[in-house]
Amino acid sequence: VPIVPVTSLDDPRIADYRSLRDQELLQRADPLNPAAHRGVFMAEGELVVRRLAGSPFALRSLLLAESRVEPMRDLLERLPPVVPVFVAPQNVVNEIIGFNIHRGVLAVGERGGPADLGALLARRGPFVVLEDLCNHDNIGAIFRNCAALGGAGVTVLLSPRTADPLYRKSLRVSMGHALLVPWARLEKWPDALHEFRAAGIRVLAMTPGAASRDVREVAAGLRDRPSRVALLLGTEGEGLSAQALATADERVRIDMPPGPTGAVADSLNVAVAAAIALHALL
């Protein structure tokens, strides 16, 4: 693997690392193939960078502090020779925003093309479907939960307005699992949900409404085919839209007993709710 020394953050070869604004990275084309514009994303920290290297996403480059070359040597030796590894003195790396997070290990990955929905729905499942979630912490936590609870089976599908799993914060909170858990956007929303039924997948909409059933009760009746289930979760504030609810086969909730004072929480954080429901279904 070619080690490329750099001595300044102004070096044009490391332009990807100068601005870590996610929207700018999303619009950035490959200088070697501008026509194939898909944008890039940033991986921060050793754990996330290692997961990127083992994921289906292509690595464009790495940037390491000089002190991190030896600890990363095993990974560097496995990289294709076309992936440059830029190495900079500590004072240069310190100028990159978020040093306390990346600790001198960064990488740029290339976004893939759109996934085929039919191929994804043919996967084993279960499926987690997110409508308009905008909090990157929650997105990252949901991907981490899916990796922990669903193993290799879970697929995540996103409405067009759901936050980007490859944004730096989402990716960081997911511990890099957003690179490993299969996911795609459903551009025709919510009409795409009708394709679940055609694929034999039962859609369960999570909502605390009176017409919903405890997810554990519903899960008990699905023991023969737990993988052919899609768990539909809505935005942090308003929950699922009326249109999304109308496509569901059933509405489910997480029953919460009263606390010591007799008060009952009206809802759970969406990432926590996803984890509890997935655990019940699996």
Feature names for model-found ranges:
Residues V1-R73, T162-D164:
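Boundary-proximal intrinsically disordered activation/regulatory segments immediately upstream
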Residues E46, S67-R68, V92, G112, ...:
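Short glycine-rich anion-binding loops that position phosphate/pyrophosphate groups of nucleotides
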Residues S67-V69, Q90-V92, R161-T162, L186, ...:
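Short, acidic/turn-prone active-site loops that include or flank metal/cofactor-
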Residues E70-V82, K169-S170, Q243-A244:
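Short, aromatic/basic amphipathic alpha-helical patches
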Residues R78-G98, A184-E187:
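A glycine-rich helix N-cap at a beta->alpha junction
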Residues V105-A107, N145-L149, P165-Y167, R172-H177, ...:
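Structured adenosyl-cofactor binding patch, chiefly the S-adenosyl-L-methionine
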Residues L204-A265:
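Active-site/ligand-binding-proximal alpha/beta "capping" segment
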